């Protein structure tokens, strides 16, 4: 009914996102790092999936030979600490990054590799404001197929072959100027206004017809 509030939130914070000094603080060069977020229960807590995904991440580090900045959630950090799995030295494990810093890193990354549910929305928004980035979703099924249908991101799966092919494809498409098409509801910036007007418009009707209240 209302669309996603993500674009409105990002738009309201865009100046702060663009002004972030996170690259200087972390010693990163724009366009020469991969931003990673991997925290989904199915990717972290299931042994087979965990080993498949993180082996693929190590292969990605070896292939591209650039820093992989891992914004690491507590679930993932604890899983890595309890495992004997060794991450490639190019994977830099960081505490979870703040909103402004993370989004600044997204829009300046060589590629964003993430299992976050908001990746399709962020990709659509940043494309719409002139900051497209190669977006790769490390999951086996999408939560937001409407963005996949608009070529807003690539669903890679969690195996090495799928991940490497997907990063290659996403990067080359963005380089060629083919960014996909933003999903209209993902770039709608008046969601809060719609919510207020819908509530004000329908509260009387709902109270009368659903809850049988006398107004």
What positions do the PLM features span?
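Nucleotide-activated sugar donor-binding and catalytic core shared by glycosyltransferases
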Residues: 1-215
């Amino acid at each position: 009914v209302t669309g996603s509030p993500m674009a409105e939130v990002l738009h309201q914070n865009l100046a702060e996102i663009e002004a972030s000094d996170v690259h200087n603080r972390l010693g990163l060069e724009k366009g020469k790092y991969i931003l990673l977020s991997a925290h989904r229960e199915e990717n972290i807590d299931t042994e087979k999936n965990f080993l498949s995904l993180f082996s693929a991440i190590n292969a990605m580090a070896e292939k591209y030979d650039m820093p992989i900045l891992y914004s690491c959630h507590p679930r993932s950090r604890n899983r890595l600490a309890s495992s004997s799995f060794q991450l490639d030295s190019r994977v830099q494990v960081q505490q979870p990054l703040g909103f402004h810093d993370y989004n600044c890193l997204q829009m300046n990354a060589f590629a964003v590799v993430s299992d976050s549910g908001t990746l399709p929305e962020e990709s659509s928004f940043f494309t719409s404001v002139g900051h497209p980035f190669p977006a790769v979703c490390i999951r086996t099924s999408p939560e937001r197929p409407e963005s996949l249908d608009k070529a807003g991101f690539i669903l890679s799966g969690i195996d090495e072959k799928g991940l490497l092919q997907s990063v290659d494809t996403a990067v080359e498409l963005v380089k060629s100027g083919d960014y996909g098409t933003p999903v209209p509801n993902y770039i709608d910036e008046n969601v809060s206004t719609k919510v207020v007007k819908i509530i004000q418009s329908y509260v009387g009707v709902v109270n009368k017809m659903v809850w049988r209240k006398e107004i």
